[in-house]
């Protein structure tokens, strides 16, 4: 809860289009807390709202601003983009990250473009994106984004529409970059895991020995 409040305040202070944070309310001491924010009354999710060029520009500008301040939202999907009277709001910062990897930031861009294209088309979104991002940045975003890097809701809506928006964006690019593989395991991570397990085993043996020895 404290982390989400902190992230939301960083977004707010950086002039990102997020609900105004109003603080934390304690419901049950040391157990339940509630993060209070401005309520975006009358807003619609991006998957249902009318998306015009102004809204597209606002969504892309939000990603550019996060890049500039060294942050990533990490959960850009229709439910987390609200539109009211032509204004876009970015909500739910629980998974946001400070000083993310370039890969994380690239994924934010591709997911934002995919969400905005759900109610428009890849051509319009790509044309607007080129006003704020280079072709190389957009190519990197779509090289990093596919399958598990897309939020579940976004993948489901793409399937329901029967549109290959990811493929549409790739076809618009002047060049493609090799897909960035999600590396779940590396030799370094494997080695650290083995060392940790071995150390835990040694500690357990020593503890059992001490407990079994006479005082």
PLM features: residue spans?
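Regulatory N- and C-terminal appendages and interdomain linkers associated
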Residues: 148-215
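Structural motif in protein kinase domains
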Residues: 41-47
